[in-house]
Amino acid sequence: MRGTIVRVSAVAAIVGAALALAGNLVHPRGGDDPDFEVYQRFAHSTSLRIADLILIVAIILLTVAVVGIARSLEGADLEVFARLGAMFGVVGGTIAIAQFGLESYAYRLQSQVFEGARRPDVRSAFWAANAVDHVNNGLFITWTLVFLGIAPFVIGLGMARSA
């Protein structure tokens, strides 16, 4: 059973990593450009939704991999690391999916509203897009900390203890 979990987790990790790489290569960038230019670029982006869809599938596969690797830790003294690592993996993956969904729908939609706003509405449309942008960034920072930081750290501690 343990061998099957490890193999499935390894395949999920490999495919998820390849999809994450592809999704990030396709994803439009904001860079250090002024916010209004970024919103205009995202309003016209044809690759944002495709990239986010690819990244959602990647995160699902990587979450499966993290949970499987965590569950492969055996021994009573390692159970806490396995459970915490799996929990942080699921929590981080869930936040990531929410962030990609928000970005793909609300961020792009509000950028389009800003782009098409008439003169009297430009300021409020900008600040609405800016608010969605800040929520999107907050979710991104949170899931990267939990999914790419805490989950592998806890699982790594368990693996180091098992060696």
Give the predicted meaning of each segment.
Residues 1-163:
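Hydrophobic, aromatic-enriched alpha-helical segments typical of multi-pass transmembrane helices
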